[in-house]
Amino acid sequence: MASFYFSFSIPLSRRSLLALGACALPARVRARTQVDAVIVGAGVAGLAAARQLQAWGHSVLVLEAAQRIGGRAWTDRHSFAAPVDLGCSWMHQADRNPLTPIARAQGFTLLAHDGAAEHFLDAGIAASAQQRAAIAAARQRLAQAMDGVGPQDAALASLCAGACDPARQRAIRERAELDAGGAAEDTSVLGLRAQGSTAPNWLVQQGLGRVVESLARGLEIALGQRVESIEQRGASVAVRTAASTVTAVHCVVTVSTGVLRSEAIRFTPGLGPAALAALDALPMGHFNKVVLELDGPLQGFAPGDWIYEGRSFQPQQALAFLIHPFAANLVIAMAGGSFGLQLACAPAREAQQQVLARLRNCLGGLGGRRLRAGAATAWARNPLFHGSYAYLRTGGGAARAALARAGGERLHFAGEATAGVLAQTCGGAYLSGLRAAAAIHAGLALT
C-alpha cells in the first residue's frame, strides 16, 4: 500500500451518491445542480461545514474527488487485525476538541495517551538515567528557547546553532519533522508557538477516521467529482467538474494547500495576492506511517508505549515507533519531513523492510516475532493532497488567518491550514468548517 490515488470522474448519479452506504445518503438519481452552498471536499472541514449549514436549513451539496469520504482522516479496517488510522490518529486538546463529544455520543472507545512510557534503546540496551534526563532537559530548554523568540520569528533549527548536543538535536527534530512535518530549517517558531500544546491527546480504538466518517450521515455527497474550476459570478458561484456544473450562492473550498498551490483548480477571478502569499507560506509538510503487523506481541512493552532509538538516533532520519496500540500486534512507525517523504516515495515493501530493520536494531532483535503484514502511507504522492498537512514557513506570520479570509464574500477557504490553535489537526479542520458555515449563514440571512 505505497500510495492512495483517487482520480475517478463519474456523473452525479445514484451510484456516486450512495457509495457511502451506511451513511444513509439521499437516494437521488441525480444530485442537485443549484444549492445554497457547495462544499469542495468531504474531509472533516467540509463535512463540518455541510452539517452545520444543513442544520440551519440551507441546501448543501458536497463534491468529493475521491471514491471515499474523510480526506486525510482515513481508517483502514481491512488490512490488519485491528483498525489503523492511515492519516490523523489523535484527538488533540481532547478536553475541548469538538470531535470528542461526537465520538463519545456514538460509543467510540477513547484512550488518553499522554502518559505512555517512552523507551530509548540501542541494540536492546536501555538509555541510562543520565541519558534520559538529558533528553528531558533538552526538550524543556527548547520550549523555553521558543518562548524567547521575538516578533521577527526564527527557524526552529536556529535554536540549535553552533555546537548542538545530540539531545538538543533530537528535541529539534521531534518538534519539526516528527510534529510539524517540515524541515527544522524552514519551520516557523512563532507558528508552532501559536498552535499551543496539543495535550491532552487521545486515541480512538475504532479509528479517528471512523469518527469523521460518521459526520457524513444525512448529507448529500457526490463522490468521484474532481472540481476543475470555480467561477464567481456576482450573486453566485459556479463549480465545474468533468460531469456537470453546480451553481450555489456560496462555496467552501477545503482542499489542501498542496492542491491549491498546484493550480489543479482554476479560479475565476484568480486568487489574489493575499491568498497567493498565504499559500507560499503554507507548503505541505510530510508525515507518513509505516505499519508493521507482527505475529505476536513484543515483550517488555505496554500497549501504546513509544520506542525511540537512543544513541543511534539519526536526526535526519528520525523515527518514532508506536507499540501495540490497544493491545493489537501492530507497530506503527512515524517519519516526517524529508525522511517521511523519502519513505513515501520508496516502494511500500522497501519502506517496510527499512523500518523493520531499524526496529530490529533498536530492540536487538524481535524476540522471534515475524512480519505478518505491512503498509506504508504516501500522502505526498496522492494528487488529491500532495502532503500530510500544511506547516508555516519562517516569517509566514498570519498566513493561516489570511488564507481563511482570502476568498471574499461568496468564496470561503477552510481546512487544517486555516485553523488557529489546532492548526494541522483534525479538530482544527472541523472548527474551520464551522467558521465558514457561520459566515455563509450570516450572508444568506442578508439575501
Regions flagged by a language model, labelled:
Residues 1-12:
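N-terminal secretory signal peptides
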